[in-house]
Amino acid sequence: MAHKKGVGSSRNGRDSNPKYLGVKIFGGQAIEAGNIIVRQRGTQFHPGTGVGLGRDHTLFALVDGKVEFSVKGAKKRRTVSIVSADA
């Protein structure tokens, strides 16, 4: 009979850092050029007028104005646009 207890190793004990994804500025809110609108993996939201697409699919404002979310096309794509504040 063994005098020492067999010691196993756990297969858990890992966790990834939070990525802080999601919509940062919602529809109708004012935004300045350069501000991030959506952080995402892939294009869940597509860029519309006045919105740029970053290398990691982040959507950001190219102009000042108000954020507007809409669903367009037969594929029902969710697009994000900037409507100028003076319009």
UniProtKB/Swiss-Prot annotation:
SUPFAM superfamilies: Ribosomal L27 protein-like (SSF110324). The keyword Ribonucleoprotein applies. One of its GO terms (biological process) is translation. It comes from the Bacteria. It comes from Stenotrophomonas maltophilia (strain K279a). This is Large ribosomal subunit protein bL27. Belongs to the bacterial ribosomal protein bL27 family. GO terms for molecular function: structural constituent of ribosome. One of its GO terms (cellular component) is cytosolic large ribosomal subunit. The gene is rpmA. The lineage of its organism: Bacteria, Pseudomonadati, Pseudomonadota, Gammaproteobacteria, Lysobacterales. NCBIfam families: L27 (TIGR00062). Keywords: Ribonucleoprotein, Ribosomal protein.
